[in-house]
Amino acid sequence: LGSFQLEPMAVKIVVFSDTHLHRVTEEFESICDHYCRDADRVIHLGDWTSASVWNFLQQYPLEGVSGNMDDMAVRLQLPARQVIRVGGFRIGMTHGYGFYGDLKEALRREFDGVDAILFGHTHRALVEREGGQLFFNPGSVFSGRGSGRSLGILTVGRTLQGEIVRL
């Protein structure tokens, strides 16, 4: 019999951005229950809008950054950008900004040497690899601009993989 090596236990990270909720809705609770209950981490990339969303998501292992539409209670709790380590990977997180040049180049400059850059703001889902980096935007749960409603799932094991879940 041949031998094989099993993939080490992968880490599941649910990624939200641009929820733009003034209060937690039943629909958001249902989405979170479905996708986050077995997640190892939950990341929110800003524009939570209300601190009630931040408070609600703290029932999960939560990381996050603030966005341009967040109220002061959220901005005081969260940085505008941060880098976390998951397994052997460095992951940069920011909300993003109204940038009209080469967005990927601007993000690359902001997060030198990371394996992945997670960002929101555009409400457009994106999963692309370029120059050895993963660029990942989960889109928006409630107001996708042209790309529909979505969230993201990162799977971290031997590799770092991103997937968009259409809602």
Regions picked out by a protein language model, each given a short descriptive name:
Residues L21-V24, T49-V53, M69-R75, G98-L103, ...:
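Active-site environment of divalent metal-dependent phosphoester hydrolases
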Residues D70-D112, F142-S147:
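Active-site-proximal segments of metal-dependent phosphoesterases and phosphodiesterases across multiple
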Residues A10, F16, V86-G87, R109-G113, ...:
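Binuclear metal-dependent phosphoesterase catalytic core
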Residues Y60-L62, G132-Q133:
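A short helix->loop->beta-strand "cap" motif at the edges of active sites that frequently abuts
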Residues D38-V42, G67-D70, G87-I91, A116-G120, ...:
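Glycine-rich loops and low-complexity Gly/Arg-rich segments
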Residues V15-S17, R41-D47, E63-N68, M93-H95, ...:
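Active-site neighborhood of phospho(di)ester-bond hydrolases with catalytic His/Asp-centered motifs
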Residues Y35-C36, A106, G157:
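A generic membrane alpha-helix/interface feature
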Residues G2-F56, Y60, D70-A80, G88, ...:
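N-terminal active-site segment of His-dependent metallophosphoesterases
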